[in-house]
UniProtKB/Swiss-Prot annotation:
This is Probable cell division protein WhiA. Involved in cell division and chromosome segregation. GO terms for biological process: cell division; regulation of sporulation. Keywords: Cell cycle, Cell division, DNA-binding. Transmembrane segments: none annotated. PANTHER family: CELL DIVISION PROTEIN WHIA-RELATED (PTHR37307:SF1). InterPro entries: Homing_endonucl (IPR027434), Sporu_reg_WhiA_N_dom (IPR018478), Sporulation_regulator_WhiA (IPR003802), Sporulation_regulator_WhiA_C (IPR023054), WhiA_LAGLIDADG_dom (IPR039518). Residues 279-312 bind DNA. Disulfide bonds: none annotated. GO terms for molecular function: DNA binding. Belongs to the WhiA family.
Length: 322
């Protein structure tokens, strides 16, 4: 099961303690996934479609709890793609259904919503704002597995509703943005801290902990990778330097013989040939008294300069300081 599905299953079990919060959450769910059917004699019925069984059960429970109307759940099987079940929560035409439309800002006689965005009365309190956000996420949201890229989004087909969702999230200091995607509008968050705050607002506390643990693990893994890469780079640099030093020393040995070098350079060359993998510090400790790392490096550089001169065609007439 995806991280997004696990998060939705958790949120589907969250029940608002106040009627106003339950109404706000239901309004968001219907706004995201609901559609109105009109039959003869202007009889209205309401269908709410979701692919998540837990969300369907929540919609059913909220409708029964808030309005007490006859409600049914139908299951349909998709015939394409992943062939997931589709759950349809249906409220058939009956007396009292107008109360649902009224609560959502829908007038049956006009065949349209009086407010394309969020009905402001539904989110008058902070608790209701959080509940509406939870409902919107359950109805059209998703969140990436935190082991990958950080991304949370809510998709709606209404531009005004998308903008209202952005403003709702910004009210809670979440820097949400909206982007068009074909015939849809995507409200999204990118930062890990922002997503954690959003999960907390919606009361997805278990998902939040899983997200945080995955983020910490990912951070540690990335840090280890950086350290390993750094160590590898340093090791490669050291190995390349040692190889170059050995090449210079062998060149001098073949060209003029190491015995013609001044004693400090001769000893340095011989120690390097004897200990090709040793660091400069380790080489320096072979002398009595020990020679510092900078001193060994200075001698190595003299050997390198001499080898370069001889490679350029110059004759060797004894070692002279530059």
């Amino acid at each position: 099961m995806s991280f997004s599905a696990v998060t939705k299953n958790e949120l589907a079990r969250v029940v608002g303690s106040k009627k106003c919060c339950r109404m706000a959450e239901l309004a968001a769910l219907i706004k995201m996934d609901g559609s109105v059917q009109i039959s003869g004699q202007k009889k209205f019925s309401l269908n709410i479609v979701t692919e998540n069984a837990a969300v369907a059960r929540k919609i059913f429970t909220l409708l029964k709890n808030l309005f007490g109307l006859s409600t049914e759940i139908m299951v349909r099987r998709k015939v394409r793609l992943r062939k997931n079940n589709v759950y349809i929560v249906r409220i058939p035409a009956q007396p009292g259904i107008e109360e649902i439309f009224k609560a959502l800002g829908f007038q049956a006689g006009s065949f349209s919503f009086t407010e394309e965005g969020i009905v402001k009365d539904l989110i008058a309190r902070d608790c209701c704002r959080k509940a509406y956000l939870r409902g919107a996420f359950l109805g059209g949201g998703s969140v990436n597995n935190p082991e990958g890229t950080y991304h949370l989004e809510i998709i709606t087909d209404n531009q005004k509703h998308a903008q209202d969702l952005v403003e709702l999230m910004q009210y809670f200091q979440l820097p949400a943005k909206v982007s068009p995607r074909k015939n849809w509008y995507v409200v999204y968050l990118k930062g890990s801290e922002q997503i954690i705050d959003c999960l907390n607002l919606m009361e997805a506390h278990s998902a939040l902990l899983d997200f945080e643990n995955a983020r910490i693990y990912k951070g540690v893994r990335n840090q280890v990778n950086r350290l390993v890469n750094c160590e590898t780079a340093n090791l490669n640099k050291t190995v390349n330097a040692a190889v170059r030093q050995l090449e210079n020393i062998k060149f001098l040995a073949d060209r003029i013989g190491l015995e013609k070098l001044p004693k400090p350079l001769k000893e340095t060359a011989e120690y390097r040939l004897q200990y090709p993998d040793a660091s400069l510090k380790e080489l320096g400790e072979l002398w009595t008294p020990p020679v510092g790392k900078s001193g060994v490096n200075h001698r190595i550089r003299k050997i390198e300069r001499l080898a370069e001169k001889l490679r350029s065609g110059k004759e060797y007439h004894g070692y002279k300081e530059d």
